[in-house]
Amino acid sequence: MKIILFPLFVAVIAVGCATSKKSTAIPIIDTHIHLYDTTRPEGVPWPPETDKVLYKPILTEHFDKVSDENGVNATVIVEASKWIPDNQWVLDLVKHDPNRYIGLVGSLEIGTPDFKKHLFQLSKDKRYVGIRMRERPGGDAFFENKAVWADLQLLAAMDQTLDVLMFQYSIEDVDMVAKRLPNLKILMNHVAGADIEGKPADPKWVDAVQKVAKNPNVHCKISGLFQQSDRQPSPKDVSFYKSELDVLWEAFGEDRLIYGSNWPVTMRGGTYAEYLAVVKAFFADKHRAAQEKYFYKNALKFYGLPPLKR
C-alpha cells in the first residue's frame, strides 16, 4: 500500500506547489509594444527599411510567443505610425484577443483641424485609451498654437490619456502642460528621457524629474531602458541603471511608475527576458504591493482599463 501511495503523494505535492507558484505570481501588463506589418502593400512609415533589426513583420503571433514565455498577461500597444488609418488597423489586428491586447495608445497629430473628429471616432472603441505626442510640428512654437491647447483640453475632458515620447519634448514641457491642465493624465515614456551611462544621474535631469513629479497627474514609464543606455548591446545588470531608477522611485513612488518594455525595439539591446529581468531585479527589494502596482495595477488605473481576464 505504501509503495502505491508514495508516488501519488509526491504527485499531489508537486501539483500543489505548481499551483501555489502560479497563484502567487504577480500579473504583468506591458504598456509599451509596437505592432506593424512591413509586407503591407502600402508599407509602413516606421521602422525604415535600413533598420536590419526591426524592419520585418511584427504581429500578434510574435508577441503572443514573447508574452507567454515571459509571463506577460496583457499589453497596451503604442502606435508608432503617423498614418491616421493605422490607428484602426491596429485595433482590427488585435480584436481576436481582447483579453491579451487590452488597449491602444493612438497616434493623432495634436493641433490639426481633424484631430477632434478622429478622436471622437476612434475613442468609440473602449480599447482606445489615449494618444502619444511624438512629433513636434512647429518646433519651439508648438505650444504657442491655441489649437494644441484646445486638443489637450479635449483629451482631459474625454478622460483620454497623454503619453509623451521624450525625444521631441522636454521634462519642462511636460511640467508646463501638467500645471495648465491638472485633469489631464500624462505619462512620460522611457524613463523620462534619461541618458543612462552607468554613473550618477545627470543633476539637471534629476532636478527636472523632482520638479515635474510634484504634479500628481504626471506618471512615468520605466520603459526603454535598453534604448536609453549609452552602450549596445545594453548592459544586463540592474546596477548600470540603478542611479536613474532610484531617482524615479524617490520622485514618483509606488503609485505613479508603470511597466513597459518598448518591444520590439528592445531587440536592439537584448532579449525580452533580459529586459524584464533588469526591472524585476530593481523591484525585488520593494514590498509586494509596490511590485503589483508597478507591473499591472497602476496601468489599469492610469489607462482606465477593466480588470485582467488572463
Label the predicted regions.
Residues 5-14:
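Bacterial N-terminal signal peptides
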